[in-house]
């Protein structure tokens, strides 16, 4: 789909500037003033600031294990509504993402439910207890954004 955002405000080198953004299939393909871009949808963005997607490196999506508090579907939708396109989900889950098998449970939920890019953390310690045996960080590092025991000192 081709979309044109007209006269939005962008912050450029410390100054606000009015620009048009041409978007094709979700990708910005042109930026400038008074762009000619045949589009299926045109939005008048005067009075609105245009920003790239935001990133939040500390969110609680609560699945698996605590879906009565939040789910990946509801949490990621709320993040998208606020302009966040990428979030990093804390590991205070049940089971804690402390092994390949436990992380796979969370990854399957993310794959099936998230409406934005959700990157999981793995826990530092087994069971996210803040003490005792460490997780196999080398085995998990390629699948997570980092390691945390979220709220528990190690």
For every predicted segment, state its role.
Residues 1, 38-40, 46, 50, ...:
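Short coil/turn connectors at secondary-structure junctions
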Residues 1-53:
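Histidine-rich, glycine-flanked metal-binding segment
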Residues 8, 26, 47, 58, ...:
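Divalent metal-coordination and catalytic microenvironments
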Residues 27, 59-61, 152:
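Short, glycine/acidic-enriched loop or turn micro-motifs at the edges of active sites
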Residues 44, 89, 149:
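Redox-cofactor binding/interface segments in oxidoreductases and associated redox assembly factors
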Residues 48-113:
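Metal-associated gating/positioning segment near the N- to mid-region
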Residues 93-104, 109-154:
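Histidine/acidic-residue-rich, glycine-tolerant segments that coordinate divalent metal ions
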């Amino acid at each position: 789909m081709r979309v044109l955002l007209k006269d939005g405000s962008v912050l450029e080198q410390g100054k606000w500037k009015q620009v048009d953004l041409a978007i094709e299939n979700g990708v910005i393909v042109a930026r400038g003033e008074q762009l000619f871009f045949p589009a299926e949808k045109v939005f008048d963005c005067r009075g609105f600031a245009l920003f790239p997607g935001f990133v939040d490196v500390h969110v609680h999506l609560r699945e698996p294990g605590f879906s009565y508090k939040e789910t990946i579907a509801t949490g990621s939708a709320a993040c998208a509504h606020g302009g966040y396109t990428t979030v990093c989900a804390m590991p205070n889950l049940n089971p804690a993402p402390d092994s390949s098998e436990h992380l796979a449970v969370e990854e399957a939920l993310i794959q099936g439910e998230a409406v934005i890019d959700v990157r999981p953390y793995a826990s530092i310690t087994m069971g996210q207890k803040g003490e005792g045996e460490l997780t196999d960080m080398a085995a998990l590092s390629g699948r997570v954004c980092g390691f945390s025991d979220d709220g528990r000192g190690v």
